[in-house]
Amino acid sequence: MEILIIVIAAVVGLALGFAIAKMLEKKQASGTIASAKKEAGSILKEAKAEGESIKKDKILQAKEKFIELKSEHEKVILSRDKKINDAEKRIKDKESHVSNELGKNKKLNKDLEEKVADYDHRLDFLEKKQEDIDKLHNSKVQQLEVISGLSAEDAKAQLIESLKDTAKADAMSIIQDTVEEAKLTAQQEARKIIINTIQRIGTEEAIENCVSVFNLESDDVKGRIIGREGRNIRALEAATGVEIIVDDTPEAIILSCFDSVRREVARLSLHKLVTDGRIHPARIEEVVKKTRKQIEEEIIDIGKRTVIDLGIHGLQPELIKMVGRMKYRSSYGQNLLQHSREVAKLCGVMAAELGLNPKLAKRAGLLHDIGKVPETETEVPHAILGMQWAEKHGEKPEVCNAIGAHHDEIEMNSLLSPIVQVCDAISGARPGARRQVLDSYIQRLKDLEEIAFGFGGVKKAYAIQAGRELRVIVESEKVSDEKASNLSFEISQKIQTDMTYPGQVKITVIRETRAVNVAK
């Protein structure tokens, strides 16, 4: 029973609490609604005020935009009206100009028609005059034919033939005079150019280049160079390919070899060995190997210095090396580099005298004998071989042709070719240039003259042109014209039989007859 009362009391308490809570909630909600209504009224009032303000601003902006668009539209209309007015004005001006031009053209056409009519009248008059002249001409021609007894065609043919013969005679006379003058002038100019060229070049005589002499401080060094049982000298000869001659010559050893490079390698190697003091086969091989490398470097330096001295640029490295190697080559005993430098200078001077390119001429002169550089023999002539190398290394066609044609192996098609040929002959043919020291050169000239004096009737004999020509003056009483021809042949045969000489010897026999009388 007590439990039931407690449960009922609890239920009643809960119901009462719930009712009180509901009453409190309703009271609170009514207060909130009133507040919200008040706040909503305030917001609505503010929104209306702001909307009126925005509406006024938009209306004002729309008015301003309308005014702006109206102003721009008026400007466009004004501009368009101006363009239309300008176009109308230009059209009116053109119409006026066209009208003026039409008026002028009408006037010109009228003047032209009048001139054409006048010219037609004149042409008719001239044609009539021409007919009268033709009739008169034919009449005169007929009268002349009757008087001369020749027709007009025959007279014309005779006149043409006479004029032709006269013109031929005059032309032949002019041609002969021109040819003679050209020959004389050409010879004089050629002599002048060659003489000027030679005078401006200083040259040296050739040197003997088959042996070199290595000087020693004392004869005691000779034994060390020879070595025990000659092993050092044999090792040196085997390493260099040079014959080493040790004789009784005091303080000197002779190095003999046709190859200048080998001889120079041997000389420098000996100098290093003697200076160092260590002379034995192993050391000899080491020094010779280093010396060969040094010589190769010197060859390149010599080539570079040579082309710089001559003012030649753009030469390929392989050609520069060939130029340097020329120092250790010889041609008929003449040092090849000295000869090529000399020819290059001669070519430069001669080309300048003739108004040609001196630099190109120097280039051709320097390279003209590069075909003689290789150590091994070849079946190709050195001029052709040099031309092939020059072509291979990009030299100009004029230079290549000058190299290949300087001994007439190919046809000359460049003005440089005869210049190189002439300068090569000048350098090689002068006294003492090639292997013949002055004494042997003079002796050969004397022998030529002695052979001429060995024949009867010879009055005088002169060896000239560096021994390339022998002029023989004979006594006219003893030698007739027929015998003079036979004498030159006999002298040439005698020279061929008894003498050794380079090139050719020209024999010229001169017979002179003089008749002298005295008027008293």
Curated annotation (Swiss-Prot):
CC per GO annotation: plasma membrane
Record-linked SUPFAM superfamilies: Eukaryotic type KH-domain (KH-domain type I) (SSF54791), HD-domain/PDEase-like (SSF109604)
EC numbers for this chain: 3.1.-.-
Transmembrane segments: 1-21
UniProt KW Transmembrane helix keyword: yes
GO terms of molecular function: RNA binding; RNA endonuclease activity
Residues in KH domain copies: 210-295
Top-rank taxon, per record: Bacteria
A GO BP annotation: mRNA catabolic process
HD domain ranges (all copies): 336-429
InterPro entries, A to Z: HD/PDEase_dom (IPR003607), HD_domain (IPR006674), HDIG_dom (IPR006675), KH_dom (IPR004087), KH_dom_type_1 (IPR004088), KH_dom_type_1_sf (IPR036612), Ribonuclease_Y (IPR017705), RNase_Y_N (IPR022711)
Keywords: Cell membrane, Endonuclease, Hydrolase, Membrane, Nuclease, RNA-binding, Transmembrane, Transmembrane helix
EC top class, as a word: hydrolase
Annotated compartments: Cell membrane
Function: Endoribonuclease that initiates mRNA decay.
Family stated for the protein in its record: Belongs to the RNase Y family.
Name used for this protein in its record: Ribonuclease Y
Gene that this sequence comes from: rny
